[in-house]
Amino acid sequence: CEQRYFGFLNRFHMFKPYYMLVFHHPPFEKRLKYCKYDHIIFECEYYYKKMCRMFPKQADKMSLCVWGPDLSFYPQIDLNFDEPILISNGRTNRDHNLLVDAATYAKVHTVIVSDEKHIPSNFTDDNQYVEIYKQNVLNDKKMVELLCKCSIMVIPTFPSEELLGPIGNTSFCDATALGMPCIVASNTLMAENVMKFRLGLVYNVGDLNDLTEKITYCREHPDTLKEMSRNIKKFGRENDSLKFAMVIKNIVDSFY
C-alpha cells in the first residue's frame, strides 16, 4: 500500500516531504525494518513499548497517543445502572454468538447492532434478553440516540494469537464520550486501559463462562458501574480528539 511504498522510498532519501504515520494495524515489524518514517504514533502502549524495545534506534521517533472521541458530537446524559442494558454496536470481528449466549445465561437485556447478513446464528426471535437492532446503512446520529438508551458497552471479539489492531476503537470512543463502562475481550487494544484506569471489565476472550460472570457482575453491582462511569468519562475528557490533534500538530511543528 502507499504508506509502505513511501516509507521504503524515504529510507533511501527518495521521498522529500516529512513522513509521519499513525500505526494502528499490526504487525509493525516489517514496516519498521524496511521503511523509514520521520515520526510514528502508536495508539496502544503495549505495541509502543514493544516496538521501542525491538527498534531502539528509532525509539526517539516514536510516540504514544490514544485516539479519542469528538466530545462535541455527543450529548451529556445520565445512564441507568440499576437496570443496565448492554450494547455491542460494532461489526468487525465481533463474536456476537458468544454474546447472545452469555447475555441469555446472565439474564441481562442486551442490544446487538447488526445488518441482515450478520445476525448471530444462535439468535431467535423469542429470546427474552437479546434484541437485534438492524442497521444496514450506517447512521451516526441514530447510533448515538440508541447508545443513550443503553448503559454498558460490550466489545466481544474473536480469539487471536496477538492483540488485535484498532478493532473496537470506535465503540470504545463512543463509550468514553458517554461515560459507558465497558466489557471488553482480553485481546483488544483497549483492554489494558480498561484494567489500568478501571473503565470496566475485561473477560478472557472466547470464554463463555467468564463473559457471563462479567455481565452478571454488572447487573449485581450498580454502584461499581457508577464509579466506572465517572472514570471512563474522565478518561474521555483527557484523551479526546483535540488532544490527539495537538499531539500531531506539535510533532509537525518540530519538523520545522
Per-range role (PLM):
Residues 81-143:
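Conserved catalytic-core segment of nucleotide-activated headgroup transferases in glycan assembly
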Residues 196-197, 201-208, 217-223:
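Conserved acidic donor-binding segment of nucleotide-sugar-dependent glycosyltransferases
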Residues 151, 179-181:
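A short alpha->beta transition loop at the rim of the catalytic pocket in nucleotide-sugar-dependent
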Residues 238-256:
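C-terminal alpha-helical cap of glycosyltransferases
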Residues 49-53, 63, 68-83, 97, ...:
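Acidic anion/phosphate-binding donor-loop and adjacent secondary structure
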Residues 28-29, 38-61, 192:
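A short, active-site helix/loop in glycosyltransferases that binds the activated sugar's phosphate group
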Residues 210, 217, 224-238, 250:
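A short, well-ordered alpha-helix in the C-terminal region of glycosyltransferases
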Residues 141, 155-173, 184-192:
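Nucleotide-sugar-dependent
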